[in-house]
Design a protein with these regions (language model features):
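Predominantly flavin-linked oxidoreductase catalytic cores and closely associated redox partners
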Residues: 1-87
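Exposed alpha-helical structural elements
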Residues: 4, 73-74, 83-87, 163-167, ...
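Short coil/turn segments at secondary-structure boundaries
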Residues: 19-21, 89-92, 181-188
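FAD/FMN-dependent oxidoreductases across multiple families
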Residues: 37-40, 50, 63-147, 151, ...
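Short secondary-structure transition/capping segments
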Residues: 47-51, 55-62, 130-139, 175, ...
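C-terminal segments that line or cap access tunnels to active or ligand-binding sites in enzymes
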Residues: 52-56, 137, 156, 160, ...
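Active-site-proximal substrate-binding core of FAD-dependent oxidoreductases
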Residues: 128, 143, 147-199
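C-terminal auxiliary extensions adjacent to catalytic cores
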Residues: 189-249
Length: 249
């Protein structure tokens, strides 16, 4: 379970198009990873709308309990980041809210998600899927809702609303939602590995610093640079992250 904090900021359409290099009613969706919640799991997002921006962070509750920084302060720090600050300058806050986001995937789904006259959809069904590259929330909720609608229509037509679970389970398993849930069922555990938020950012930072160093010595060959920092940051742990990613993503 994660906590999402979102703020909606007002900005003229022309300014949005200029800052995000958009035209012809295009939109942009930016996802951020790294030290959003210090060196603990967490991410952030910035979406463009017609005349507003949607900006926020999403951090697992386990990260928030370990972090010494309040959740609201994490959002403030994210907004002040040099990569984000120019994109949201001269905006006005219109909305501010928080929401618990279930990102556990397939293994967090309730065993019984329908019954006598009731069924679960959306967050209650745990239909949000974090693929590690994108977060599929709204589209998967709509896909689950379509399966729910098909179930209710069939139950009403046959006058059998007593036990919806067998039919709903059948419709969910036939939907895109089930395919996506199965495909990325191990990703939630993969994203909890601390290396993604601690070791990998430090590795990339060290390599970039040495690669662009303008000191009095020539820059070492790239392969030598990579090998040096890979060993220094723990080659086998990094290799484990890569192997798991190739297996699960």
């Amino acid at each position: 379970m994660a906590l999402g904090i979102k703020e909606v900021l007002s900005l003229e359409t022309s300014a949005i198009e200029e800052r995000f290099h958009l035209e012809n009613n295009e939109g942009a969706a930016l996802l951020f990873s790294g030290r959003i919640c210090d060196d603990l799991p967490g991410g952030a997002f910035l979406y463009t709308n017609q005349q507003t921006l949607s900006l926020g962070i999403v951090c697992p509750l386990s990260s928030l309990t370990q972090s010494r920084v309040p959740a609201s302060e994490l959002l403030t720090r994210f907004k002040a980041h040099p990569a984000v600050r120019p994109l949201i300058k001269n905006t006005e806050s219109l909305e501010y809210g928080a929401h618990l986001v279930p990102e556990g995937g397939l293994h967090s789904m309730p065993v019984q998600y329908a019954g006598n006259g009731w069924l679960l959809v959306g967050d209650a069904l745990r239909s949000c899927v974090n693929t590690g590259i994108s977060v599929r929330g709204m589209d998967m909720a709509l896909t689950g809702a379509q399966a729910a609608a098909q179930t209710l229509i069939s139950a009403c037509q046959h006058r059998e609303p007593q036990n919806l679970f067998p039919l709903y389970h059948h419709n969910v398993e036939r939907s895109l939602l089930w395919d996506v849930l199965q495909r990325y069922q191990h990703v939630p555990a993969l994203l909890q590995r601390p290396g993604w938020y601690r070791t990998w950012p430090a590795l990339m930072q060290d390599i970039s610093r040495d690669l662009w160093d303008q000191g009095d010595k020539p820059v070492p060959p790239l392969r030598q640079l990579f090998w040096h920092h890979l060993r220094r940051h723990g080659l086998w742990h990094l290799a484990g992250d890569v192997i798991r990613s190739l297996r699960y993503l």
